[in-house]
Amino acid sequence: VEYFPTTEPHDEGYLDVGGGHKVFWTASGSPLGVPALILHGGPGTGSSPGQRGMWDPQRYRIIQMDQRNCGRSTPSAADPAVRLTDNTTQHLVSDIEQLREHLGVDRWVLWGGSWGSTLALVYAQQHPERVRAMVLVFMMLARRGDLRWLYQEMGRYFPAEWERFRAGAGEENEDDLLSAYNNLLNETTDESVRRAAASNWCAWEDVISSLDPGWRPGPFYGDPDFVLQFSRITTHYFSNDAFLEPNQVLNEAHRLMDIPGVIIHGRDDRANPYDMAWLLARAWPTAEFRTLPGVGHTPASPSVRDAILEATTRYADLP
């Protein structure tokens, strides 16, 4: 099964969400189709046109938004003078609701990958009546231990690369690399220090999934503006526990029981270990849980593609 051809947007714009922030959005596919919202990962990557291919453009109204301070949303975190104090998970949930109202959507299908799955779940738990169905890939609970795994403990798989990552934060910060990098990226006034930290951060991000079959280096890590935007936003969120209460996503899972959903997760996902998806499936038993043997944390896997297309095809027929 192949993805659908990527269609160009038939509508786009900037939504003023307050506080000087404007969120960029696009709509493609059928203007009269089932509304579907794609929530990108990161946080801080921005939207990818290729993700539209997961949806039948004849049946879906495919909506994308660049989360605050990234992609084409303004102001951009690529500008070091831009402060990120008004960029939290709750701000993003509010932005999604404002976009839904702006576009005249009653209920929509949500797709989220990795961090996007976290955001989709938090939004759905607060606004379950606005969610028609959910497709979650590479599930992330974003608990403190999950984040420590990514940036501390995962160094056991990549000791040489992690040594370089750790050294970039300074020897005295070995036990809290998230806070150290957040300070280097969001508090320092030295541009050369900030750029070096951004480069080191993205080098580690690129390593995380490098054992997966079909892995390719991140295509945007050669863009200094993307590198700074992404690393600043990611460290801002993850050094603050993603602005979530402890175990929030699992504790609020009971609010999802009336929402159809599918959790698609690679059994060999090292970035977001399998237990995260398993725990969510246990807390949300009405969702379908698709375990993909031999699959890691890469969307290039044919079994990931097939599982996504099966779900989006089925959800196009929901009332």
Residue ranges of model-derived segments:
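N-terminal cap/lid segment of alpha/beta-hydrolase-fold proteins
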Residues: 2-23, 234
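Conserved HGGG/HGGXW glycine-rich cap/lid loop of the alpha/beta-hydrolase fold
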Residues: 17-75
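Conserved acidic catalytic loop of the alpha/beta-hydrolase fold
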Residues: 90-108
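Conserved hydrolase catalytic core segment
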Residues: 106-145
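A catalytic-pocket lid/entrance helix-loop region that shapes and gates access to the active site
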Residues: 129-183
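Conserved alpha/beta-hydrolase "acid-adjacent" motif
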Residues: 245, 270-276
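Short beta-strand/loop motif that positions the catalytic acidic residue
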Residues: 256-257, 263-265
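Catalytic active-site module of serine/aspartate enzymes centered on a nucleophile-bearing elbow/loop
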Residues: 287-319
